[in-house]
Amino acid sequence: MSVYRRRLSPLKPNQVIDYQDVELLRTFITDQGKILPRRVTGLTAKQQRAVTKAIKQARVLALLPFVNRES
């Protein structure tokens, strides 16, 4: 029987997720600009919803690209 280790969340429990913190948000998107799923990021459901909302708001305000185009 294999033993699974519980992943630690990359965010602190009370850390505020802000749409203006682009460097933090970039850790949760792929090179193509897609939002990483919860099973990859290791976030809680509540944190994942907050990150998703922040990324989408940052995209609308042109702080993050919708699609990362390689030229």
UniProtKB/Swiss-Prot annotation:
GO terms for cellular component: cyanelle; cytosolic small ribosomal subunit. It is found in: Plastid, Cyanelle. The gene is rps18. InterPro entries: Ribosomal_bS18, Ribosomal_bS18_CS, Ribosomal_bS18_sf. HAMAP family: Ribosomal_bS18. Its main location: plastid. This is Small ribosomal subunit protein bS18c. It comes from the Eukaryota. Belongs to the bacterial ribosomal protein bS18 family. GO terms for molecular function: small ribosomal subunit rRNA binding; structural constituent of ribosome. Pfam families: Ribosomal_S18. Keywords: Cyanelle, Plastid, Ribonucleoprotein, Ribosomal protein, RNA-binding, rRNA-binding. GO terms for biological process: translation. Gene3D superfamilies: Ribosomal protein S18. Part of the 30S ribosomal subunit. PANTHER family: 30S RIBOSOMAL PROTEIN S18, SMALL RIBOSOMAL SUBUNIT PROTEIN BS18M.
